[in-house]
Amino acid sequence: MYNMMETEIKSPIPQSNTGSVTGGKNNSANDQDRVKRPMNAFMVWSRGQRRKMAQENPKMHNSEISKRLGADWKLLTDAEKRPFIDEAKRLRAMHMKEHPDYKYRPRRKTKTLLKKDKYSLPGGLLAPGANAVNNAVSVGQRMDYTHMNGWTNSAYSLMQDQLAYPQHPSMNSPQIQQMHRYDMAGLQYPMMSTAQTYMNAASTYSSMSPAYTQQTSSAMGLGSMASVCKTEPSSPPPAITSHSQRACLGDLRDMISMYLPPGGDSADHSSLQTSRLHSVHPHYQSAGTGVNGTLPLTHI
């Protein structure tokens, strides 16, 4: 067994620097002068096992082979590991004799990942040659947010510059860019039409208040009611007879007394409560006819 391991160890030594030749002349010269560490027990065992597994699975990656070899090494017992441990000790003793001044110096990492490179998307997910297009796309999309809702893009632009992720070129289409803009003209509510009709109806009722305030200034709440119902100036109502004015004034007092607590007026509230519900509907009819001027000719 030891003879087999010695042949496996001695034979691949000239092939150890083949991978470094492709790195360049300077790297190859440095690798030849560099003294390698002695192999441990796992490396002695995995050298032959790795070759077998690579022949059985030619498409398997080297990292996957290393994972499987590590799992298999843990499953071995101490008796099975003993010959490889002894061989590792022998190689270490030979290494110390050949290189007495050897000191382990780990290699420095040549490339240090920046924060921007660490959180950026990998280039394999994008189409080749799309990096040059992505910069223009990201700048164009950041400009879409500049005057949105009337606010300038001061702090948000800085954040976008720091977090400028590469995006797909299809995001530059005009349909998608229009989605980032708000159209304030389309935010008109349909409730405005109903509000205008409500205000127009209120103006017809408020047009009667000047005529009533000229007749009687002692009516309760007429001043406040006229101030609440102030709207657009409307055309003055036609002349109304004294009979219709008294009827409308009485109905108007009944409507006001409906919302007042009992005891505030000298009138009989028990009689008013019975006539309130009956007088509300004729009030609108008489008010509408008085304002629109559709009274019979006999009353004029």
Swiss-Prot record:
Q: List where in the cell it is found.
A: Nucleus
Q: Which SUPFAM superfamilies match?
A: HMG-box
Q: Which regions form coiled coils? A: none
Keywords, A to Z? Activator, Developmental protein, DNA-binding, Nucleus, Phosphoprotein, Transcription, Transcription regulation
Which Pfam families does its entry note?
Answer: HMG_box, SOXp
- Residues carrying Phosphoserine: 235
The protein's superkingdom reads Eukaryota
Q: Where is this region: Disordered?
A: 1-35
**Where is it chiefly localized?**
nucleus
Locus of motif 9aaTAD? 251-262
Please give the biological process terms from Gene Ontology that the record holds: brain development; central nervous system development; negative regulation of transcription by RNA polymerase II; neuron differentiation; otic placode development; otic placode formation; ovarian follicle development; peripheral nervous system development
The UniProt transmembrane annotation reads none
Residue ranges the UniProt entry marks as DNA-binding: 35-103
Kindly list the GO CC terms recorded for this protein.
nucleus
**CDD domains per the record?**
HMG-box_SoxB (cd01388)
| A GO MF term | RNA polymerase II cis-regulatory region sequence-specific DNA binding
* Compositionally biased intervals (Polar residues): 13-30
Q: What is known of its domains?
A: The 9aaTAD motif is a transactivation domain present in a large number of yeast and animal transcription factors.
Q: What does this protein do?
A: Transcriptional activator.
Q: What protein name is recorded for this chain?
A: Transcription factor Sox-3
